[in-house]
Amino acid sequence: MKSTRKRDRSPKTYTRLTHPLVRDSRDEPFRRATWEEALDRAARGLGAARGAFGMFSCARATNEMNYVAQKFARVVMGTHNVDSCNRTCHAPSVAGLSAAFGSGGGTSSYEEIEHTDLIVMWGSNARFAHPIFFQHVLKGIHNGARMYAVDPRRTSTAEWAESWLGLNVGTDIPMAHAIGREIVHAGLVNEAFVRRATTGFEEYRELVEPWTLSLAEKVTGVPAAAIRELAHAYARAERAQLCWTLGITEHHNGTDNVRALINLSLLTGQVGRYGAGMQPLRGQNNVQGGGDMGAIPNRLPGFQDILDPAVRLKFESAWDTVLQPRHGMTLTEMFEAMEDGSLRAVYCIGENPAQSEADSDQAVRRLSGLDFLVVQDIFLTKTAELADVVLPATAGWAETEGTTTNSERRVQRVRRALTPPGEAREDIDILCDLAARLGHDWKYADAEAVWNELRSLSPTTTA
């Protein structure tokens, strides 16, 4: 029997925030407030939870906002409990690339893929999810590049590939190891590069030795001939690009997945030359920048190690503070700490975890159990509906001055094109006003002043 009830498929309409909102108790509705009242309330609530505080920063906001947000957490609140979706989606890429190259970003520019000879899209549907990048891919194909797609699904990206390797979910490492073993046994290792620029080759050879093509076929579901073809094509190419996204990183063993791909690049010397490299494709406009700015619990700006005494001393001198020699809590750990009561207040900027977390019901329950929640956003999101104080911010892509950093680590200027509605204010100004109420008088004339402070502290942005 066919149902006659029509399902409403229209998207949820969000209300643009134009004025600060506060509530006098959790049982009462929001009421409009002045900025003075809202900031005073936010400062009192956060100040009372200095030892049990977490900051959610935003990968869609500017570099400058993310820098000031992590500084607020570390200097004003005395904690490294700061995180954002830039870590939750691509932390494995940062971990793997940092271990191999000392920096948690891709090694190539977008333009280089137009002039490469071979493209491997692994766990990435770039045609759908990264349309700007895929325009460069199409130019590369037009210029003669061959493309292979490794993905459990035959995606719209795979439709452009010369060959689609539809591996079973979770078998990326067996596939990569089989490719590596075939390259070794076929005598296709770039021995000069391996000797000059790598360590651990003998250990790697022993690691991949069990992964014969026939075993890999049984485990991955991909024909041995197809695996062999990709191995030879990648190793023999004069220049090859290896690209991945969340199909590689969002696994419990995501970092190992990334390292398995990096090893293929090192094995063949497909890195460090124009047109040859690795590209982790980021999901939002400033995912790369959020990590670069230190809006993560285990790194300071420039991916500098919190556990390094010399690094801490540099930041302590610049910020006139003392930094704890330990990592903060990740977003997941912060939600767990809400459950056990060790995290009592959260300052959430531009994120909507009440809707984006895998278990949204659990997220709502835990956020509702906080002593104090401040949300700074442009819309009254589901998370904002749970807040004690809501602060209206400017949109990061049309109403703000600053910069963002894309997947190829290109820093791009953002200029204000529209006047913010109502009383909406710049994120940085809001953060600085809150910091002042909590005893830290930061004077940034504009976003450029923030950028210049960052440049003085981060080796990756000194140019």
Where are these regions (language model features)?
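Residues at alpha-helix caps and immediate loop-helix transition turns in enzyme cores, especially N-
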Residues: 65-69, 132-133, 256-257, 358-360, ...
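Short, polar loop motifs at secondary-structure junctions
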Residues: 151-156, 376-382
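Domain-level signature for respiratory redox metalloenzymes
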Residues: 50, 57, 165, 169-375, ...
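N-terminal export/assembly segments and adjacent metallocofactor-ligating motifs
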Residues: 1-186, 196, 223, 265, ...
